[in-house]
A protein has these predicted regions:
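N-terminal ligand-binding/catalytic initiation module
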Residues: 1-158, 353, 392, 397-398, ...
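Anion-binding alpha/beta catalytic cores of soluble intermediary-metabolism enzymes, centered on
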Residues: 85, 137-184, 406-409, 415-759
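Rossmann-like adenosine-cofactor binding region
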Residues: 237-305, 310-312
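Glycine-rich adenosine-cofactor-binding loop
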Residues: 66-78, 83, 167-171, 181-207
Length: 759
């Protein structure tokens, strides 16, 4: 995991716009009529309806999708009591997670009040605004009383995630670990090291699932909590043991079946793990340093089943697996509470998910052939897209069956489909691409190594574990620029292609290229001269296996790069062209656009190749291709010019690929409006389908369209260009590409190299 510096963190949070969240209108506001509907006088009508029936607030406002993340800053992460305002970045971050994982809107509320009674009154006063309340970073024991009172006195879901999030995920892990080792939950002995909010909640949930309370031993900073201890809180009394023969962790853990650590790092020794029962379960959840490291636990004995809070080891216990989806299910049923039935439903849904076949996208992110249920995998991965549908639906169903729901769901398949549609960016594509690249980083050559943006991207890619960068350029210039930018080039290879020390490599590359192209008018001397050019040299590094991928474009015209790529790398078998694609991640969904850079005025055969390459690319990104070939006419209404070429291309594709979901030619608005298309052109192969791929009739149309959207809709994430059709991973960037753009293309190049390696 890349080290995060103070400067990185502050720069990220400040940025061009401080903070991590914003409020975005969801209704039109462009005309005076729009504004009259949004505010006075039109706004009076929903106000009056809500006055008559308060439940209509869920119908006419965002209440049903709005959660308050509320804190008083008394127990912020590992920072302690830093105050309400100081904790605001954490609350904004929690809001970000709610949004990206479950599409839930969040207002972070920082209440500068440590008195529980006054805090409760403040929260109650603002509660009508929200559909749910997530309590965050409130110290124990006050957090227990605050949550209890708010749950009793409010009619919306309230959950203190610090307590219940860890409990729910670890409980799911416990059930599955017990299935792996074959032990009976009613007989296991549990040691809980820590007695804070999360520890108490975990113990309570374990008991609800079948652990006997008398089989639990809990420890705090003073040792074993037993009935002889004085001045215990009510929560500690609840789990005080009657045993007086044990006082320390070392004594308590002998013969234990499960260790749950919610305390501090490096407190559990190898010897203690060896003293546990057979096939012990160890949940070492202290952060950032667990009670025992994964390596030490595995060295202590081979039969241990271990989970930590860290993402770089198997079976991570991460609250993000739970809270977004628990609130999603609660909000979608307008539940009055998050009760025990809903929490238990979440536990079982999460546990069950780990036993199901894993989506290929998850395997790719973690670079395994096939994750299967067992010792190395008994808790679902946070990137699993099924969490949204399965956990949310389980919680919603439990809300309905337990009687706390005010809205019913009749069609559960449609509900799950709605969740995917509602999220828009259902695949969290960018995150998954970067995670996949990190799982198996490759050697990537950056052509313009002395360009500030490319150097920054290369350094960031190395720090994030995306690739092993190789910078092409003059050593001295690169070193000087790195110093000016205060960047460390440690671990980054610099290749000065024009230096004498590279003479033998230039000659070797020239001979290989000459042998490949000598029947096309090449001479060795010409080939050798070309090796002084960064694109020829860099692509030959990939061609010969000295590198795995190549990125270029900041200084070079595409026409030249295209020519070099065809000469050095060549096209994939079965294709006469190559092309590029951009990915558009919008609130409406993820769209793929081609060809955005390569083919200026494609004829019919070229359009067919672009469609074939696009279909292949969609499968590469784990999307079902639903492709529209667009033009200025609809289904033959005008067969002149480029529309005629598109029309002919569709005829060929329909004939050669009768099962593909592709049609055209059609206008862009028809392609993107399913209802309009279905009503006007019910004969289309795309009937009832939402298009996710647009293939344009010419380069100017595709390029202008995505760049216009980039300028007019900054909240749309644009990813690319992505090369399709070359034999090896050669990828291009725009001359105005940002560091993030280059980083994204780098991740794509790495995945391309991983795929190329498997061929």
């Amino acid at each position: 995991m890349a080290k995060i510096t103070k400067e990185d963190a502050l720069r990220y949070h400040e940025g061009k716009r401080p903070g991590k969240i914003e409020v975005v209108p969801t209704k039109p506001y462009f005309t005076q009529n729009d504004l009259s509907l949004a505010y006075s006088p039109g706004v009076a009508e929903p106000c009056l309806e809500i006055q008559k029936n308060p439940q209509d607030a869920y119908r006419y406002t965002d209440k049903g999708n709005l959660v308050a993340v509320i804190s008083n800053g008394t127990a912020v992460l590992g920072l302690g009591n830093i105050g309400a305002l100081s904790g605001k970045p954490v609350m904004e971050g929690k809001g970000l997670l709610f949004k990206i994982y479950a599409g839930i809107d969040v207002f972070d509320i920082e209440v500068d009040e440590s008195n529980p009674d006054k805090f409760v009154e403040a929260v109650k006063a603002i509660a009508p605004t929200f559909g749910g309340i997530n309590l965050e970073d409130i110290k124990a024991p006050e957090c227990f009383e605050i949550e209890r009172r708010l749950k009793e006195e409010l009619d919306i879901p309230v959950m203190h995630d610090d307590q219940h999030g860890t409990a729910i995920i670890s409980a799911a892990g416990m059930l599955n670990a017990l299935e792996v080792n074959g032990k009976d939950i009613s007989t296991i002995k549990v040691v809980v090291n820590g007695a804070g909010a999360a520890a108490i909640s975990c113990a309570r949930l374990y008991v609800a699932l079948g652990v006997k309370k008398e089989n639990i031993v809990m420890l705090d900073s003073k040792g074993v909590i037993n009935t002889k201890r004085e001045r215990l809180t009510p929560e500690k009394i609840e789990f005080a043991t009657t045993r007086d023969d044990i006082h320390t962790l070392e004594e308590a853990i002998v013969g234990a079946d499960l260790f749950l650590g919610l305390s501090k790092g490096n407190i559990l020794t190898k010897e203690m793990v060896r003293s546990m029962a057979s096939d012990p379960i160890v949940f070492a959840l202290a952060n950032p340093v667990p009670e025992i490291s994964y390596e030490d636990a595995m060295e202590s004995r081979p039969d241990v089943l271990i989970s930590t809070g860290r993402s770089d080891y198997p079976n991570q216990i991460n609250n993000v697996i739970g809270f977004p989806y628990i609130f999603r299910g609660a909000l979608d049923t307008a539940a009055t509470a998050i009760n025990e039935e809903m929490k238990l439903a979440a536990v079982r849904a999460i546990a069950d998910l780990a036993k199901q076949p894993v989506p290929e996208i998850v395997n790719e992110v973690y670079h395994v052939n096939n994750l299967t249920f067992g010792r190395e995998y008994f808790i679902p991965k946070p990137v699993d897209p099924r969490l949204l549908t399965e956990v949310s639906a389980a919680v919603a169903r439990a809300a309905i069956e337990s009687g706390v729901a005010r809205k019913s769901i009749d069609d559960w398949d449609r509900y799950k489909e709605h969740l995917r549609e509602f999220m828009g960016r259902e695949s969290k594509l960018t995150q998954q691409i970067h995670d996949t690249a990190r799982s198996h980083p490759k050697r990537v050559v950056f052509a313009e190594g002395a360009h500030p943006s490319m150097m920054k991207a290369a350094v960031q890619a190395k720090e994030e574990g995306i690739c092993h960068p190789i910078l092409l350029g003059n050593d001295e210039r690169i070193a000087k620029l790195a110093k000016e930018l205060d960047l460390s080039l440690e671990g980054i290879e610099v290749v000065n292609l024009r230096h004498d020390r590279e003479a033998s490599r230039r000659e070797r590359y020239a001979r290989i290229l000459n042998d490949k192209r000598q029947r096309e008018g090449y001479t060795f001397e010409e080939a050798n001269d070309k090796m002084f050019e960064r694109n020829y040299f860099g692509m030959m590094m990939v061609e010969t296996g000295d590198a795995d991928a190549f990125i270029t474009g900041l200084y070079t015209k595409y026409s030249n790069t295209i020519k070099v790529a065809k000469e050095v790398i060549g096209l994939q078998d079965g294709f006469d062209h190559f092309a590029t694609m951009h990915i558009l991640n919008s609130k409406k969904g993820t769209y793929f656009v081609a060809d955005t850079l390569i083919n200026r005025s494609p004829d019919t055969k070229t359009l067919v190749d672009i469609a074939r390459l696009s279909e292949k690319a969609l499968h590469f990104f784990n999307h079902e291709p639903v492709m529209a070939m667009v033009s200025y006419s609809n289904f033959g209404s005008d067969k002149g010019g480029s529309a005629g070429d598109v029309h002919e291309a569709i005829e060929i594709l329909h004939r050669e690929h009768p099962n593909w979901l592709i049609d055209g030619e059609m206008q862009v608005n028809v392609a993107l409006n399913r209802e309009l298309r279905d009503s006007k052109y019910p004969f289309s192969r795309l009937y009832g389908k939402d298009v996710n791929t647009l293939i344009f009739p010419c380069l100017s149309a595709a390029n202008s369209s995505y760049k216009m959207l980039q300028a007019l809709s900054p909240d749309t994430e644009i990813f690319g260009p992505i090369q399709m059709g070359l034999n090896k991973p050669i990828h291009f960037i725009d001359f105005e590409s940002s560091v993030q753009d280059i980083l994204n293309v780098t991740a794509i190049a790495v995945i391309d190299a991983i795929t190329n390696e498997k061929k």
